[in-house]
Amino acid sequence: MNLVDTAEMYDNEELVGEAVHDCREKVLLVSKVLPSNASYRGTKLACERSLLKLGTEYIDLYLLHWKGRHPYEETVRAMTELQQEGKIRLWGVSNMDTADMERIVSLSGGSGCATDQVLYNLGDRGIEFDLMPWCAARRMPLMAYSPIGEGRLLHHHTLVEIARRHDVSPAQIALFVDDASARYHCHTQSR
């Protein structure tokens, strides 16, 4: 699977759209609405702008980028309608903590939240203590961003040595450990 992650904030959706145009059906396309645009009407308009810039009829996963001033009820209602209209396949959130997630899933339509995209890597593991178990108990996958710590982990002497011993790259070890840790936490929470 090929995943391309963008957002209206990144100001690169047109470029991404051009890049995936010839292989759109083979790409899982993720985009995000800015919190300042996350009112009911604003979310729908932001999605329309993203679809236009991306040159696609649908977005595979559309996320609320982080919490803002607009009530979650409005954003969830807009996301649910966008999904029903076929403009997005799935919707979720990004950078939400456990309290935010509890609030979101308690709303009408909130159970449709597919994921929370959060910072997670060998150097940033705080979610293992609350958010990861919470999501695992609900069988909601987490989506890690910066899984190799923006590259800063790739030169850590321990990671380099483990990678050398297994004849793989430090990035492969970092991704494997992130994945194994996520699976371990999901498995232990389901017992």
Language-model segments: residues:
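Active-site-proximal beta-strand/loop segments in catalytic clefts of secreted hydrolases
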Residues: 7-10, 32-33, 147
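A short, structured active-site edge motif that brings together acidic residues
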Residues: 26-38, 61-65, 118-120
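Beta/alpha (TIM)-barrel catalytic core signal, keyed to glycine-rich beta->alpha loops juxtaposed to Asp/Glu
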Residues: 12, 67-191
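CE4/NodB-like, metal-dependent polysaccharide N-deacetylase domain
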Residues: 43-63, 81-85, 107
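Short amphipathic alpha-helices and their capping/turn segments at secondary-structure boundaries
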Residues: 17, 47-52, 130-133
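N-terminal binding-site loop/beta-alpha segment at the start of enzyme catalytic domains
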Residues: 1-27
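Glycine-centered flexible beta-alpha turn that most often forms the glycine-rich phosphate-binding loop
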Residues: 4, 59, 91
